[in-house]
Structure formats: C-alpha cells, structure tokens
Amino acid sequence: MAFLKKSLFLVLFLGVVSLSFCEEEKREEHEEEKRDEEDAESLGKRYGGLSPLRISKRVPPGFTPFRSPARSISGLTPIRLSKRVPPGFTPFRSPARRISEADPGFTPSFVVIKGLSPLRGKRRPPGFSPFRVD
C-alpha cells in the first residue's frame, strides 16, 4: 500500500510539473505573438501601412519620370551630362566616312557596294524602301 501511495504521489507530482511547464510555454508563445503584432502595428503606423504602393520614395511636386531630373527640380541650373561633340557631328554618318573626309589618304577596311543590302547580300532596286508599301 505504501508503494502504491508513493507511486501515485510521484505520478501526481510529475503531472503537475509537466502541466506548469506547458502553461509556461503557452504564456511565452502568447507574449511572443503579442510582441510580433505590436511590431507590425508600429511599422504600419510608421510607414503608413504595409502596402507596397504606400512605401515609396518621396518625389518633389511636379516630378514626372519622363523629364530629366535637372529640369523637374526648380532652382537648379541645368546640368549637361552629355559629352561635347564636334560641330557638324551627326550619329547617322559612319565614322569611316568622317575619317576619310578629314584624311584624304585614308581607305576604309571594307566598302559597302551601293545597292547591295549588307543584311542579306541581295541587290535592292533603286529607290527601294522597306517602309514603303506599293
């Protein structure tokens, strides 16, 4: 009988101890969830909500992405970011032609025959335009 009492008290004691551990773990989880919710709320208040549309850079009034930044912000002198080019420069003339005009002894390494398409090697009729539809 004494053995049965001791074992019953032991089981009861271990049950109470394990129950207190479970309650403590539940309390810690609850506190952690509460902390996470408070952090999320504080972030939401700080950034005006968690929507990606609301979290964006501040832009000056009148700013449009289609104009250069120097023109969109008033009060700044215009900044030329492009490099200076020689007078008469056009990007539609080949550099070989420019060099040959400057140096009469220059010969280009390749010559495109007039009327020959460099893409397919086919002759095009005079006045041909790929943009004109007959």
From Swiss-Prot:
InterPro entries noted in UniProt: Frog_antimicrobial_propeptide
Q: In which tissues is it expressed?
A: Expressed by the skin glands. Expression levels in inguinal glands are much higher than in granular glands.
Query: Which ranges form a coiled coil?
Result: none
Q: Which residues form the propeptide?
A: 23-44, 71-82, 99-121
Subcellular location(s) per record: Secreted
Biological processes per GO annotation: defense response
Q: Does the record bear Secreted in its keywords?
A: yes
Q: Where is the composition biased (Basic and acidic residues)?
A: 24-33
Example GO CC term: the record gives: extracellular region
Secretion signal, residue range per the UniProt entry:
1-22
Positions bearing 4-hydroxyproline? P126
Q: Does the keyword Amino-acid biosynthesis apply?
A: no
Annotated GO molecular function terms are: toxin activity
Q: Where is this region: Disordered?
A: 24-71
Pfam families named in the record = FSAP_sig_propep
**Cysteines joined through disulfide linkages:** none
* Keyword entries, A-Z: Amphibian defense peptide, Bradykinin receptor impairing toxin, Cleavage on pair of basic residues, G-protein coupled receptor impairing toxin, Hydroxylation, Secreted, Signal, Toxin
Family of this protein? Belongs to the frog skin active peptide (FSAP) family. Bradykinin-related peptide subfamily.
- How is this protein named in the record? Bradykinin-related peptides
Organism annotation: Physalaemus nattereri
The gene designation is BBN
